[in-house]
Amino acid sequence: MKRIFSYNSFRMILSLSLILGSIGIASAASSTALPDPNRIRYKPLSFEPPRAERLRLENGMVLYILPDKELPLVKIKVVVRTGSMYDPAGREGVAELTATMMGTGGIAGMSGNAVDETLESIAAAFHASVNRDSGILSFSVLKKDLDRGFDLFSRILTQPSFEEMKLTLAKDLKMEELRRIVDDPQKLAFREFGRLIHEGSPRGRVTTSASIRSIQR
């Protein structure tokens, strides 16, 4: 009985100590007045956004060049006026599949796997994506490998081969994603909201399994 009483007493004392300590901390915190934000003084902030050089090529393409010598890395981003809203009726999803295939489908004279291996060998990275009204193709490579990397990047942009096997895989993955959309209520709600709000407009069209199956090389 003495042992039980001692244990219970210890638990009670410990609990009271914790409660009193918490009250003390809360009281101390509440007694510390916060400074008036209107009376806070600080040095004026100085910021000058970097200025990019703007060039227009003979073909009408506009370039923005911004040197940054902090790292020996060259980053290139190409923005194209395209997107899912320009997909032909009945072939919704073609813009997204095109972006996927740009990164995996290979180029003339080189398979997709060979392109991946070459990019990895020079620590370069390529990524393509599209939204409703634009497409973005990004590339980064070390300065010492710029010539080799830029040659490969330009071939990806101008000579994609869209391997049949990689296209079939991309279509299967997209159709599986569409099948599983009912498992994500938020994603499903956004899709249906876009369909309703833009009803009758190209922006209101949605990708379906049937439209994906209709896409061929």
Where are these predicted regions, by residue range?
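Proteolytic maturation boundary segments
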Residues: 4, 25-65, 73
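Bacterial N-terminal signal peptides
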Residues: 11-24
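Scaffold signal of the M16-like zinc-metallopeptidase fold and its non-catalytic homologs
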Residues: 29-37, 106, 149, 181-217
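Soluble periplasmic/extracytoplasmic beta-strand elements of cell-envelope proteins
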Residues: 54-56, 62-66, 75-79, 118, ...
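M16/insulysin-pitrilysin zinc metalloprotease superfamily fold
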Residues: 104-110, 140-173
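Acidic/histidine-enriched alpha-helical segments
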Residues: 115-121, 161-179, 190
